[in-house]
Structures are given as structure tokens and as C-alpha cells.
Amino acid sequence: MKYENKTVYLEANENYYKGAPKIKYLQWRETSDADKIAGVEQGTIDLSDPSGSKSAFDQIKSINSNGELDGDKIMVNATDNLGYGYIGINADTVKVGDDGSSDASKDLRKAIATVFAVYRDVAIDSYYGDAASVINYPISNTSWAAPQKSDADYKAAYSVDVDGNALYTDDMSDDEKFAAATQAALGFFEAAGYTVEDGKVTAAPEGAKMSYEIIIGADGNGDHPSFAILTDAKAALESIGFTLEINDVTDSNIMWDALNAGTAEMWAAAWQATIDPDMYQTYHSESVKSNYYHINDATLDQDIIDARSSADQEYRKSVYKQCLDIILDWAVEIPVYQRQNCIIYSPERINADTFTKDVSTFYYWYKDIENIEMN
């Protein structure tokens, strides 16, 4: 019908092929995330999609009289997001010498990645609670190609030392794990050619540095799922003489401009995935515009082509597992979290019995929008 004041006004098509929608008029309004839950509570919004964070779920529970996510004021539909959060490392700017594919360059990145990885559990639980889980491979858990914990060769990301020995045991405390990761980082730094003396990194090899920057779009105030990972990692690395500079930008375009220019060293972001897990756009060496990692591996390139050329899902899954292992060996990506998408609505104004059933990652609430009724 029209658009004005950041609102789209829509009128139902009575000749819609699935039947005339029960609701004749809709307004889609641009709203800040901070106002979405309160808007549904106060009646200015009927349905919305706030970020599914721990604080958001706690807010919803406090609004409902039963203290649950589904209650008299707000109903919640939460599904796994088709995508995942990660920390990236540029192999062209974080390397030893002039070869980002060398073992020394990989060891440098593994030193940093190992420290990042050990702080994921605490940070993600603090930010998301039950609304997200830590992942160990650079692929969304919603994908049929994602490795499962029940797989024989499944392992936590960056959980071994420079000699391939497991860093952690089930009975270790968090502090013991943090200490083990920091000690392992020293081993990787030394293997990369850094000078290590008395438990500290004292000098970098040619082409490498003692300080690197990571960019994160956390609104300048640390509001990001991975921000706590960075601050904890910064302190741990500084304790062994290595500096991690955190650049928390208020404008995320600064980060994306650096990625597009190939100048970023490290960054924290999230990928939006597709139903098919084709990896060409993100990891193939000829995908120059979106291979922000600058990973250039002939075996990986061929595996990506082989997997996308087959219709055999089991074969593709096994080849994609090989791809994931290569990406982790290059240490250009630290998988961080699989979060949930959240749709909330007011049962006081929307008839809950008519709301879309069996909402999932791949079946959105608006697939049956024509059946939804207002009270």
C-alpha cells in the first residue's frame, strides 16, 4: 500500500493461492532490538524478532506471570539460526615470512587460536545462556554436513598442543584449562620461530609481529557475543609477552571495509549460511571477494569442487569434513557459537492456536501467515 516513517503498510491479497489471509492489514515497522520485547509487552508491537540472548530471555520471563518463556504476555518460538559466529584470521597478514601457508605461519595462528578457543564456553554461556552453544567446526550445526559429537573423529577446536597431545581432560577446572591453553600457545609461538625465554615471548621472527589487531563490531561498548573471548584472550596473551589489540568499532562498515581491502588481521563476525553447505564462496582460493581468510590450499580447492560436483550426500559430507579439517589446520577460523533465532508474539492480541506450527530453521513462521488470526 505505502511506506512512510520506517513503516511498510500491506493489504492482504484475497486471491492468495493458499486462501485469503485472516488478517487483512499488516504493518512492518523498523525497530531497534532494544525496543522489541518491551513493544510486545506494552502493545505497540504484536510480533517481533529480538536477538535470542540470555538477557532477552530473562526479560521475557520477568514479563510473563508464570516466569516462563511462554506465558500470558509473550509467547516465544526459538529455532537454531542458519549460520554461526566465528573469529577469523587473515593468512596474508598474520604469518611468518612471506608464506601464509607455511607450518610456521600456521603455528603462529594456532598459538592465538588456541587461546581464543579456550574462552568460548564461558563467554557464550554468559552472553547467550541456553540460547546458543559452542561449536567446534566452521559450519552451522543446522547443516546436514556438520560433524556430530558422536562421530569417531570429532574433536574440540584447537584442543591439542604443538605435538598433537590433548590439552584438556574432563576433570579440569576452567582455570586449569586456561593455564593449559596459555602454555600451549608458548609452544606454538616457539615452533613458529618466536623467541621464548622464561615463559615469555620476547622476539618475533621475520615477517611476524609481537602485536596484532582484532576488529569487532561491538558498538564501542563490548556488546557482542565474542567480546569476552577477546578480553580474556588479551589478558592471557599479555601474560606471556604477546599483545592483542582490540578495536571495538561503532560502525561495522569499518571492519568490512578492512576485510574487503584485505588489510584486516583478525576479526569477529558471523556467517549467514545456506541450506546447501557449498564452501566455494568462502574458502576457495579463486573466490577473491569473499575469501576473507586468504586461505589458498590446492587440496582444499579440489575438495570443494569435488563436493559441489556430487549429488551423493554421504560422499559430500565426508569430503566436507576433510575441508573443515584443512581450514582448522590453517588456523584461519575459530568456530564460536550456534545461536537461536527468536520470534515472539503477544497471545493477548494474536490467537496462539492459529500461529504457525512446527516452526524450524528451515520452516519460517510466516510460511502459514495466511492462517494467523488476531484475537
Regions found by a protein language model. Name each.
Residues 1, 21, 62-79, 88-103, ...:
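Short, solvent-exposed loop/beta-turn-alpha elements that line the ligand-binding surface or hinge
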Residues 2-9, 27-95, 119, 125-131:
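Extracellular/periplasmic solute-recognition and catalytic clefts
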Residues 4, 31-35, 102-107, 175-183, ...:
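Soluble non-cytosolic domains of exported or imported proteins
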Residues 9, 103-235, 368-375:
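Append "and occasionally in soluble cytosolic enzymes with long acidic Gly/Pro-rich linkers
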Residues 11, 15, 24, 34-38, ...:
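Solvent-exposed, polar/charged alpha-helical surfaces in well-ordered, non-transmembrane soluble domains
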Residues 18-29, 208-212, 235-249:
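A local structural motif
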Residues 40, 45-47, 235-290:
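Periplasmic binding protein-like
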Residues 123-125, 192-219, 270, 311-347:
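Bilobed periplasmic-binding protein-like "clamshell/Venus-flytrap" ligand-binding domains
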